[in-house]
Amino acid sequence: MNLISKKNELKQGFYPLFFLEEFYIRVLIHMNHDHILKIGNIKQSKLIHVNRICHYLLIKRLIRQIRKQSHKYNGISEFPNYETEFYFQYKNRFYNLMIENVFLLILQTIWQHQKTRKNDPCILIHQSIQSAFPFLEKKIIHCIWIIHGNIQLFHTNQQFNFLFLLLYERIRDKSFLNLLKNIFNLKKELLIEGFYCDKFHLIELSMFLRNFYINEFDSFIVYHIVKTWKLAYLLNPSQAIDDFSFIQKNDILLNIKRKQKRLPLLCWLANKSFYSLYGNIHYVRRDLSFLMAIQAGKHISRFWKYNCIKFLQLKLGFPCSLDVLYLKSVFNQDFLFLGYRIVNKLWKKNFKIRAVSWYSPIIFFFKGRRISTKMPVFNLIHRLSVMHLCNLEGYPIHKAAWSVFNDKQIMNIFSNLLRNILLYYSGCSNRSDLGKIQYILEFSCMKTLAFKHKSSIRSTWTQYKKHVSFLSLVKNRHKNGKTSVDLYFLFQKTNKLWLLDLSKIQDSLACFLFID
């Protein structure tokens, strides 16, 4: 019993270095240095908000998974794309990268301790470096290289192993430290300050955590919906997947071992029966917010009761609760979500919308709501006015900040902006109002070019109309325009019940397909 209790004590050892939330606040503020307008006036509310993002439960889960598995470090490379399973397939590789990134962030904090600057947000508490490494006080003589940032002086294996001996005194996890040794033995240049400072902008712990959990949640949703529609999926995999499209549909189609069976009649019967039992689940996510629209069937509650809610509680550690005061204040008014208007209007069909914000551990249940198929034109014009592309009345103006670019870059910026808007709102019932947005972007582009060359709009139009001709939507009905957008979707018949299909457009996610 003593051996077992001692073993459990080692497994449940406290990791003060990784649970130190002040350390993660410092790291995250340093990574978001460019996004902070007033560095000296960091409010306490912002620190609390950052603290919620980098919650220690994520690191606790990381450590728990490290102890359960045996990891093999295969060098710094991209995720393998030859695996067949899509459900948590990058799990082992993720934890290897996490260990590397966490340790490098620790080293970076040490190196910058002696380089304090005025109003440096990276250092909120000016204390000794022992605040990050409390166990170094016992071996301070042997850790002079670490304190002065001269870790590159570890020329011998004895000095290199001594660093991990100090870590082991506090962490007491052999598998964790062995993995660290393998990482730095294969890439010892990671211990050099110059190399690390050059690569630091590529290593963002919070963004890496956030993207992984988003992909993990997407995989979880897809996995259980495919499991729910198992019969229809086995009969006709391609049609079953196309009936509910998700963020990683292309990856799913490549990774799943599909059984090639062509039984169209049975597939049609299976789809009809399963839709009547489980309903339709439409999943939309952009950045850290996601939305699920459900046309509930007879047994749709099983999916939520035993899958999604359990996943949020056990995997992410988020308590599933209701904010009654927030619901009462929001229920009687319309609001925008992901660029679409959520209308407070009772619908005949049993249609529910559930929205979750990753910044707050609350799930909101909205009953009797529906997604409006009309594009919020005035809100979109307001956003364009914030970007200084037009005024509040929708009159186009020039963008002086973009006049420093060359002509090709200016045209590409406006072309990509119009392309993204067309794709995102292509299924709206008032898609004819897209002509207003097209007009604003077209003349704003011309005015920007005229402002750059100090010429009139007429002469600028004559010179650049071959390159920046945003043709009318009517002329582009059956063919692509200069913006390389398939405008066929703009003229499809608007359905009463539609599905938002997601596609990656540059760095953002856009919904561009609406099907029944």
Curated annotation (Swiss-Prot):
Q: What's the chief localization of this chain?
A: plastid
- Function description: Usually encoded in the trnK tRNA gene intron. Probably assists in splicing its own and other chloroplast group II introns.
Q: Where in the cell is it found?
A: Plastid, Chloroplast
Q: One Pfam family this chain carries?
A: Intron_maturas2
Please report which protein family the annotation says this sequence is part of. Belongs to the intron maturase 2 family. MatK subfamily.
GO molecular function term, any single one: RNA binding
Q: Is RNA-binding one of the keywords?
A: yes
GO BP terms in the entry: mRNA processing; RNA splicing; tRNA processing
* PANTHER family associated with the record: MATURASE K
Query: What gene, per UniProt, encodes this protein?
Result: matK
What protein name applies here? Maturase K
Task: Kindly list the GO CC terms recorded for this protein.
Answer: chloroplast
Q: InterPro entries, from UniProt?
A: Domain_X, Maturase_MatK, Maturase_MatK_N
Where on the tree of life does the source sit, at the highest rank?
Eukaryota
**What keywords appear on the UniProt entry?**
Chloroplast, mRNA processing, Plastid, RNA-binding, tRNA processing
